[in-house]
Amino acid sequence: MKHPTVALLGVGMLGCAAALPAGQVANGAQDDPVPAARTAPATAATAPADFGATSDPSIAGTGFPGLAGFPGFPGSGAAQAGPVHAPSTFGPAAGPAGFQGLSGGPGFAFPGFGGGSGFGFTGFGGMSAFPGIPGFGGLQGSAPSQAAAAPSTGDSRSGLPGFPGVSGGSGFGFPSFGGMSASPSLPGFGGLQGSGPSQAAAAPSTGDSGSGLPGSPGFSGGSGFGFPGFGGMSAGGGAPSTMGFPGFPGFTGFPGMTGGFGVPGSAPDQGASTPAQAASFPAAGRAGNAIPSASSAPASNGMGAAASLHNLQARQFVGTTGHGMVPPAXGSGLPGSPGFSGGSGFGFPGFGGMSAGGGAPSTMGFPGFPGFTGFPGMTGGFGVPGSAPDQGASTPAQAASFPAAGRAGNAIPSASSAPASNGMGAAASLHNLQARQFVGTTGHGMVPPAFHYMFGWPPVIPSAAGAMPNLGTGFNADAFGAEFLGGGEMPSPTSTAASVAPTANSVPATGTAEASTSTPVASAATSAVSATSSAE
């Protein structure tokens, strides 16, 4: 309760102020009159409650929602059970289960890997939110399976766990792959097991006398499959013969290789890929990265032809160089990549070469696997008998083009179009397409476009025409993404606009010269200055 004296004093002050004439302050100085038409009403801008502060608890900080197992594909073998991964615990609260395993489906004969009826595809383990990815169970067949290799122990310095081991597939003799540690060591590859003798390891290279660096060791072949030993690769910089890579029997594509892919087995071997490759690579190539012929001097990249094989192998499947069964793209000046023939008893179809990219619709030379129709631009798929004579080189023509639709700046151009804004032709874009389709960043392939909008990850990247639509899923991907990543508050898109209330003295939208720049705040400041000057 206020003191009576204070109350009387306040009343007296109000009375004195009321007795002053209009436009006159207490010390006698003139004040700038404020017309009633320019006086802003004292309105309070009430902003709605912050969206992030009252977020839906059902999506706050949870893991990826669980997916039902893949129904599989019809066949003649037994269905493989898809393992279910443990629930994700990423976030402040335990969320629903991680991705469910993909089951093989009844008799999902994954023929084509030497297939035949009854070769089921084992289930894929689910993926937890972080950090581990369970192993791949391999391919089941008629021979004993390889035991799963022990997972790596991770790295004590980084504190990250290793990857679990991957088991081999029965019948195929694929060896077990050891887990990959977080850093820095990688486990070895044990070779391929089968019924035939192992190939001797090729001699390691001797290095290069000019560089002073040692060469790489030779690799031995695997038993039964008849892969020859791989010779070591020199440190680079020297003679064309420094690359000690004997190649595969029947494979005539690379210089320094002998034979090709005619692998000893239970059925007649495949012949060499046709047409036969030239003895040397053409010297023409991209500036600064030419592929010299086998007899030429080191090119501008400082490597001889044999040492350039490593670069060629790294590039040939992204469409930047090579030659083979598919003609090169018109106008690119670069050759295509070589074709691969199948091996006996495995039923691998031949791989067509990939052109350098950029030109005609036929530049995409990867015919795929017969019976497998999941990837765009591929024909045929995996309906290959495994015990019958080997498959020849794949011959079905590819689809005319990839769908032109894609993210702005990273579109998948058609095979007949010019290089897109990402600077790559359709053939080179295949690499990007394959890399993206399993992480949900494109609508092509086996992952539906609505993947982003169901799970909110990866974050939606707006295109030139604005953010992509919700696709009718009823799920707010942006809200989920913000909650999932940060778990903090996400301001409402209307809160900022609502907090700035318009006033009567606002400058008109037309921005005319007659608009007044005087504001109540400026008038008050002028009055204060005038009062101070008068007091002096």
Swiss-Prot record:
The keyword Repeat does not apply. Residues 1-19 form the signal peptide. Pathway: Secondary metabolite biosynthesis; terpenoid biosynthesis. GO terms for biological process: terpenoid biosynthetic process. Keywords: Signal. In A.calidoustus, the austinoid gene cluster lies on a contiguous DNA region, while clusters from E.nidulans and P.brasilianum are split in their respective genomes. Genetic rearrangements provoked variability among the clusters and E.nidulans produces the least number of austionoid derivatives with the end products austinol and dehydroaustinol, while P.brasilianum can produce until acetoxydehydroaustin, and A.calidoustus produces the highest number of identified derivatives. This is Austinoid biosynthesis cluster protein W. It comes from Aspergillus calidoustus.
